[in-house]
Amino acid sequence: MFSQRYDPLAEENNGSRPADSGFGVSLKKRKLSDDESSDEEEEEEETDESEHESSQDEDINEEEPEEEDEDTNKVDDNMEIDSQPEVDPDYIHKHQAIFNKFKQSTESETIEQDKEEDGEEDANIEQHSLVPLPQPALPRDRKLSSVSTHTKNLDWLTKPQYASPSDKKAFTDFKSSSFMIKNLEKMGFTEAFSVQISVLNMMLPEIEAQKLKPDRVGDILVNASTGSGKTLAYSIPIIESLYRRVVPRVRVIILVPTKPLINQVKSTLLQLSSGTNLQIAALKNDVSINDEKDSLTKSVPDIIVSTPGRLVEHLLNDSINLSSLQYLIIDEADRLLNQSFQNWSNVLLDKIDSQINIAEVWKLSVQKLVFSATLTTDAGKLSSLKFYNPRLIIVNDSKQLVNEIFTVPVTLSEFKIHLGVAKNSLKPLILTKFLISTNKLSNVLIFTKSNESSIRLTELLTSLFQKLSINLKIAFINSTNNRTSIRSKILKQFSNQEVNILITTDLIARGIDVASITDVINYDLPNSSREYVHRVGRTARANQVGYAYSFCFGKGENSWFKKLAHEVSRSKEVENVDLNVKELISDRDEEIYQQALHELQQQAKK
């Protein structure tokens, strides 16, 4: 029933070679070592036992020959036959994560192969480079560009007329009255400067034409550097227009920012109107509002010079009748427009409109004349003046404007003195030695940042010059001694060189009109480009030569000065002055400086 099992050991002992093992596998006989023989015997015994158990499970009633399944048994070259292990569920569960990774790896390889196949197909497709589609210009971008441009100039208001600062013309070449030519010659003026030429050429023909027909003419805005002769530019035409008047009425109002300018403008008008019966009044805070009202009522002036605040007080008290007003002149307009002054522009213009009599057909409309060295481009500020057909005159070599129109005189030379911040403690001494070394010992105007610093610097410089055996007279003007009498006295002494060096602040800068000033020194830098222009504009007036020096200590002040200078239009670049402090100041100078400081401290304690 059972076939006899083949025993390799038996065959080996018998020395015979089996033809067939009965499993359909040809076995090769090889010589084994003792250890290999023992291992081989154990494996054969295990194989016999497993085959014996499997054979018992077969049906003994079957008569057919048994066929063994050879799939699970394999014989290697070493006569080893291994059975396939059974699948263990615990084993699969334990290594499930590894199986999952293997599965994902297999899937990803399949996807990559698919992509490569797709790529081969796409390679045959013609490819084109990506180019942006053409887009229409956005209206918003155009608007923003326009707004940015308008904030840098006044083209949005009117087309500017440029005039060269070097232009000159004899006053006799204008159609002026004989008395005007004589008065100008008495004042020492024979030639008109650029700003005066531009304004006179524009206004004198219109004044002559208005004698026959009262057509309304456009307003005028003038941007010219400080000291260019703006006061004469508007004073001459208004006197030419009024000197034939019969009945005195308020026909001209001139607004200025400070009381010193009131005196300056009134003095110019009185000299130009000499020989006429024109009445000129100045409204100041020196007297009460009621006293001024009585004076205006008893003697009605033709021309009023005032600050905006004082004028508004009189308008609210009905002290002034504006029904005959012909000219509204705003001098130093940038400062007046930057400060509200009781909302003066709205009050004044509303008062003018309310007193217009539309029944008077043969009547001249009010013409506005605006003058400034730093004319603003702010539409909000300029719109409050309600211009009619405005015309803009810019006296400047360059036609490239900045946000604010700042210009300095053409004849002005500017210099920058840059020193390290460590030298700041010797600042008064450096200034003193600089003035001595450059022989700038008269007609010098020095600007400081405050009243206290101006007084302190005056005391220090006076002491230092005395100790250095140099006899100079040094004075100061600030808001602490700005009474009309004191101010006029000091300015007269300064003009006559009885005072050699004058120290002041920004508050007083615009009221100083001394033609003899040759040098301006910015001991402390100004707070804005506008103030810088008005500071340095105290010299180089009326086409005379002038010099401006600015002290910069440290990188911070140097950067600030560069910003100020960048916003100013000029015909010449700012020059740098190399100042060697070690050569300029000796040990003896420092000892004198320390003594002067000690004396000043002792005076302050008293």
Curated annotation (Swiss-Prot):
Main location: nucleus
Top-level EC class as recorded in UniProt: hydrolase
Domain Helicase ATP-binding: 211-393
UniProt-listed InterPro entries: DEAD/DEAH_box_helicase_dom (IPR011545), DEAD_box_RNA_helicase (IPR050079), Helicase_ATP-bd (IPR014001), Helicase_C-like (IPR001650), P-loop_NTPase (IPR027417), RNA-helicase_DEAD-box_CS (IPR000629)
EC number: 3.6.4.13
Motif window: Q motif: 169-197
Single GO MF descriptor: RNA helicase activity
Biological process, per Gene Ontology: maturation of 5.8S rRNA from tricistronic rRNA transcript (SSU-rRNA, 5.8S rRNA, LSU-rRNA); maturation of LSU-rRNA from tricistronic rRNA transcript (SSU-rRNA, 5.8S rRNA, LSU-rRNA)
Alphabetized UniProt keyword annotations: ATP-binding, Helicase, Hydrolase, Nucleotide-binding, Nucleus, Ribosome biogenesis, RNA-binding, rRNA processing
Stretches assigned to the Helicase C-terminal domain: 430-585
GO cellular component: nucleolus; nucleus; preribosome, large subunit precursor
Acidic residues bias (residue ranges): 35-71, 78-88, 109-124
Free-text function comment from the UniProt entry: ATP-binding RNA helicase involved in the biogenesis of 60S ribosomal subunits and is required for the normal formation of 25S and 5.8S rRNAs.
Self-association and partners: Associated with pre-ribosomal particles.
Protein name: ATP-dependent RNA helicase DBP6
Naturally occurring in which organism (per UniProt): Candida albicans (strain SC5314 / ATCC MYA-2876) (Yeast)
